[in-house]
Amino acid sequence: MSGNTLGTLFCVTNFGESHGPAIGCVIDGCPPGMELSEADIQADLDRRRPGTSRHVTQRNEPDAVEILSGVYEGKTTGTPIALLIRNTDQRSKDYGNIAQSFRPGHADYAYWHKYGLRDPRGGGRSSARLTAPTVAAGAVAKKWLAEKYGTRFRACMTQLGELPIPFENWEHVPHNPFFAPVADVQAYEDYMDALRKSGDSCGARIRVQATSVPVGLGEPLYDKLDADIAHVMMGLNAVKGVEIGAGFASVAQRGTTHGDSLTPTGFASNNAGGVLGGISTGQDIEVSLAIKPTSSIISPRESIDIHGQSTEVITKGRHDPCVGIRAAPIAEALLALVIMDHALRHRAQCGDVVQAVAPIPAVRLG
Amino acid sequence: MSGNTLGTLFCVTNFGESHGPAIGCVIDGCPPGMELSEADIQADLDRRRPGTSRHVTQRNEPDAVEILSGVYEGKTTGTPIALLIRNTDQRSKDYGNIAQSFRPGHADYAYWHKYGLRDPRGGGRSSARLTAPTVAAGAVAKKWLAEKYGTRFRACMTQLGELPIPFENWEHVPHNPFFAPVADVQAYEDYMDALRKSGDSCGARIRVQATSVPVGLGEPLYDKLDADIAHVMMGLNAVKGVEIGAGFASVAQRGTTHGDSLTPTGFASNNAGGVLGGISTGQDIEVSLAIKPTSSIISPRESIDIHGQSTEVITKGRHDPCVGIRAAPIAEALLALVIMDHALRHRAQCGDVVQAVAPIPAVRLG
Amino acid sequence: MSGNTLGTLFCVTNFGESHGPAIGCVIDGCPPGMELSEADIQADLDRRRPGTSRHVTQRNEPDAVEILSGVYEGKTTGTPIALLIRNTDQRSKDYGNIAQSFRPGHADYAYWHKYGLRDPRGGGRSSARLTAPTVAAGAVAKKWLAEKYGTRFRACMTQLGELPIPFENWEHVPHNPFFAPVADVQAYEDYMDALRKSGDSCGARIRVQATSVPVGLGEPLYDKLDADIAHVMMGLNAVKGVEIGAGFASVAQRGTTHGDSLTPTGFASNNAGGVLGGISTGQDIEVSLAIKPTSSIISPRESIDIHGQSTEVITKGRHDPCVGIRAAPIAEALLALVIMDHALRHRAQCGDVVQAVAPIPAVRLG
Amino acid sequence: MSGNTLGTLFCVTNFGESHGPAIGCVIDGCPPGMELSEADIQADLDRRRPGTSRHVTQRNEPDAVEILSGVYEGKTTGTPIALLIRNTDQRSKDYGNIAQSFRPGHADYAYWHKYGLRDPRGGGRSSARLTAPTVAAGAVAKKWLAEKYGTRFRACMTQLGELPIPFENWEHVPHNPFFAPVADVQAYEDYMDALRKSGDSCGARIRVQATSVPVGLGEPLYDKLDADIAHVMMGLNAVKGVEIGAGFASVAQRGTTHGDSLTPTGFASNNAGGVLGGISTGQDIEVSLAIKPTSSIISPRESIDIHGQSTEVITKGRHDPCVGIRAAPIAEALLALVIMDHALRHRAQCGDVVQAVAPIPAVRLG
């Protein structure tokens, strides 16, 4: 398996390149009988779409999704759901100047060595554009989980470059271009404007959360729920770190502090991030991601060409100066796909899953 | 699949419980013709073994491995290698008092809800004892990778509780009970003695490294090398965070800093941690883990019993006050299993892999 | 996994319905660097295409394939190859009269019970139309195997209803509408004309052969080469029996007859059909299939409706009176996909495969 | 994957060699809470065991199974069930004379070419002895299916060499050494005695049946129920042909005959063998197998040695002159494993399965 399929029971097979004719995916294993239309999927695609603010790539892609199969008379049939998104705004000429050399921090060096060739148009297969089909598939998973268990997914930015973003309220997230949980984002607007002007890029930290997750999801020994979450999150372009619950802070915690006390009305804290022994506890799943700065920048960088000779690389074209900005809806989709897969795996072995244990106290990280 | 198999081509299927008659694994997909004996495996098992210092559990297990199949006249045959380790020092009575209640931070709550029952003897299947077969399988992978590519694995502790451990030299690691890369470990001895006396536990941070890794390993889109590394590492008992290369520090880096420059003699830095676009670059693979404090502690904790009633839990028995101490050889094994699997996947699709790109400059993290 | 992906390393994920907007597949795992164009695939699709003689369905589908991804500058890149075939000649109204009842011998009864709904348009997902993407994927496998090992695939009809078709020569196969290895097909033309007039359908027997197959392909214990061949062949619509080599005739053979003698110049016979112990021997792979008569016939049949009430069913629409007629190119494709997958599996574990053992004597079945 | 794991959700990983220290398997995915003991498994192992009549190999193996894991207080826990069978009656010296040459019709030629070596002791991994762990795993599946759905499995011999065995009654099967459904087996006793005396071997035909199979099992497109049945059956040692329902007889049937009429009280016939469109219909599953004559015979055969030189081979040692005789319980186990896997797959995607449609008329093949 060449790694383009995600999931064991709710399987998403992704295809396409940034500058090819189309991208898309095939979802295999969706339960039959769920109402599904393009509109259900388009909403999340629009949240991820480029060109929506001056802080992201100006490539203009409507990312309109077409359902090719698996839905009959408005309902899923249980057969593969093929989703197609045509590429419409490729400008391959922008990439001509980097076809013979390698961008520092970019996948093109590794692709060249692995396959003996590479598609330099927009990064080809390594482009973050390929997260669009993942988001589309995630929308299907979200809908099923919401209808079946009331599970919800949300994500926000908690740090932009060196600026921490305090958590005020989830309500602010949809109202600013940064997916920031704060009312006033002027500081981040200014930061990004200065960054763009400098020709550089920056990293970001993203928090992802799932609520009303059924208890009992996750397969020990190796396919633990948190292991599979780490897999999808680290596999997202530019991610260099993943935390569950207290994450790296747990290193300096004592056992008497870290272990979340249980009470007759629920857990007293959530250092576990909703997972114990690799299995969901019914608490909120809490994940945090470190996203590195974009490698495609206009500032000149020292590098080599395909013949191993020293050269200088400048990446023109339309790139996100902070890929973390658009990562929130993608991270939600990835978390939904993992939970969906484990929901099906659970009912295969253990029968239908139990609803989230109630009441779960509102103790949350950050 | 219930999650007890790791890998797609070099497949390890793990079985057993902490206090059952035996634990073990079946390795399927090992190339034929490699010399292999129990001694090749025992060395790593001995590094992970309990009872080797006063800072780890005093359970006395020789962890002697028996090869049941897959080796003929001292060589692997290409058929499944079954490895068996008999349990010899179970004391199930130690666990009687916790069979009816849940330990805060422990898997038993989740197992109970998932399966409708649990094996309370030593945590049953959720016990860290089940890492022994993983270490055994990892030893087989290490041997093949060393012979074929010269790949080497090592790990050390970089933080114990709130005490950071500076990096002095890899040579110190085998000479102290903490896998610490320092000459003088008195501070850590004292720290652990005080911790044990207090009846509490602490976390740790572990660094894992692979050198001479062939370039080109890793399968985009979803089964990237770093994604699969994150999967196995987060799946290790008690791990709450995983970083590749610069990890969470990359959030505050600029693109001009983070992206490792390429020069005719190699990369100028290793913020990437040896992976670009999910594919190995030939640089050292660098991984860092956050390990939470042990949940099984002697200090009384607030909890509930299986009927949902309030209770107090004290965990007697023999437990590691810092599970991170024995994590180093396990983390090495997990990294070896991932790289082995991707080496086979690579040669399936692309033919035999290229040796590590040379020369690789000695730039390393930390 | 819902069963729409074939193969473990050369993976084909099939999607679409007979009367939806499109059908297609995603091939994951194709080695990089092979020249590939739509023309390479179209040739086999044209051999399978409906409407090419009066003996097959008169549905007029050009089955024009579009490569959506995985090919750059005329060469495979090692990333997923998505193939799209638009449906152009659906006439859903033809099926209105059977939406409320079940055709004897047809999948619609089983689909109804499995999914709680069904797509009655042309059989939806159960239609033989879904073999088109399989044929397209098989063409890619055939090309790689031919270039790498010189492996070739061919199939012919050996029985039509109760009429055995003697084997004269492979050269005749492309020159008649039955894929029959004989020069004179008048008897079969007459037979089919009479059958159509009677409103009935008939079965067929198909022989499939691969030549110049490398020795050593196949994974014991469970994924033997012949086991995987039986899997794909029995999974082909309407197939009720599969034989390898001597097949059912071997029941009455003695060991002294059945076991193919080995001589310094090759095997003396091929009762094994090219497989011993589940592993290819370098001899020709020989497979035989039993294909049942089409269930969609115009003759009235006793049946029940979806409420369990007695009814009579007549299937109008455009159907193949003998689905076996178009089965030859599909069976070739299926055999190619199995051998391709095992070629990649073999080189993953054992390194690159050995060429077919030469000389292979020309002893062939029937 | 090297092919030693069967199933996608109820996964059986098989290990061991005929003359190694032990054979066994790991079952992953068994639902928790089912009562299980060694006795539940031993019964089927005893039916398959060698040495039970003069017509089978005289190797004396008790085949005593030990449960190493996955069962706690007499119930399955949902974690891997490891089963171990020690080999006790190996006589490796019997095989010394064939280590340097290849037996016609035997796997050793293919193993040699695949792996570059082979284990000549009793055929090593290719030995029919490795069906014992499969039978053990099948016993677990049978128990779960019987308790959950009332599904039952049985198999009998329908032809021995050139002697057809008429079907009288299933009740006779356990009362003769041939698993023959007839009261008087004198003819078969005589046939086998003469065969043994002649130093030759013969084939057999086996019928396998599952009753009370839930409707809706099977995953189109590729993992159809009949496809997966064909996979396991063709993968059984010595099998050269597989039929479902009417099998090869369907070639000469007309559609008006083959398609089983539906009536308000059930199907009027069972040419389909219980599967339509790859999905179970609730009718009995009917399978037929062709088993070739044993290749290990005492009569001298023309062959080559490992240097390609002409030689003569005589196989001493203890072999079954008709491996089909012990195939009945193995075929039952294989069918049970496939149905078990699909039962779990079905409830993953579609929720819990429906009971077998009743009443199913008693129309049965042959």
UniProtKB/Swiss-Prot annotation, chains A, B, C, D:
InterPro entries, per database record: Chorismate_synth, Chorismate_synth_AroC_sf, Chorismate_synthase_CS
Residues annotated as binding NADP(+): R48, R54
Cofactor binding description: Reduced FMN (FMNH(2)).
EC number(s) reported in the record: 4.2.3.5
UniProt record similarity statement: Belongs to the chorismate synthase family.
Pathway(s) of this molecule: Metabolic intermediate biosynthesis; chorismate biosynthesis; chorismate from D-erythrose 4-phosphate and phosphoenolpyruvate: step 7/7
UniProt keyword annotations, A-Z: Amino-acid biosynthesis, Aromatic amino acid biosynthesis, FAD, Flavoprotein, FMN, Lyase, NADP
Database matches in Pfam families: Chorismate_synt
GO molecular function: chorismate synthase activity; FMN binding
Positions of FMN binding: R125, S126, S127, N237, A238, G277, K292, P293, T294, S295, S296, R318
PROSITE patterns: CHORISMATE_SYNTHASE_1, CHORISMATE_SYNTHASE_2, CHORISMATE_SYNTHASE_3
Protein name: Chorismate synthase
Gene: aroC
Function field: This reaction introduces a second double bond into the aromatic ring system.
Gene Ontology process terms (BP): amino acid biosynthetic process; aromatic amino acid family biosynthetic process; chorismate biosynthetic process
Gene3D superfamilies from the UniProt entry: Chorismate synthase AroC
Transmembrane segments: none
Disulfide bridge positions per record: none
Assembly information from the UniProt record: Homotetramer.
Catalytic activity: 5-O-(1-carboxyvinyl)-3-phosphoshikimate = chorismate + phosphate
NCBIfam families documented for this protein: aroC, PRK05382.1
Cofactor entry: FMNH2
CC annotations in GO: cytosol
